[in-house]
Amino acid sequence: MENIILFFEKENGESPVFEFLCELPVKHRAKAYWEIELLKNHGKKLKEPCVKKVSGDKYEDLWELRIKFASDISRIIYFIPIENTFIFLHGFEKKQIRFRQKSLKSP
């Protein structure tokens, strides 16, 4: 059975992961699509370092597609509602998230 990759869409039609991918530099975007293709071809058989279960009890059903290009690290968060379907929820650059968390802390 073929694996299916779906991009979550908000009610207004926006797709956070698609928008994230479009904002990446061309070479980084190509690497991201290559990793997505790996997931599509290998499904649940794909293991670390390409994919990893998100840690924490409240994130029990979430996985991350791990994308590394040179010193840039990105993640796409997804879940698997049925055996061969992967729904992409959110994409981010890892360094960017660290910066945001730091900037939210009060001095």
Language-model features, listed with the residues they occupy:
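Basic, Lys/Arg-enriched alpha-helical interface segments
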Residues: M1-I73, I82-T85, E93-P107
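Conserved catalytic cores of phosphodiester-cleaving nucleases, focusing on short active-site segments
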Residues: L89
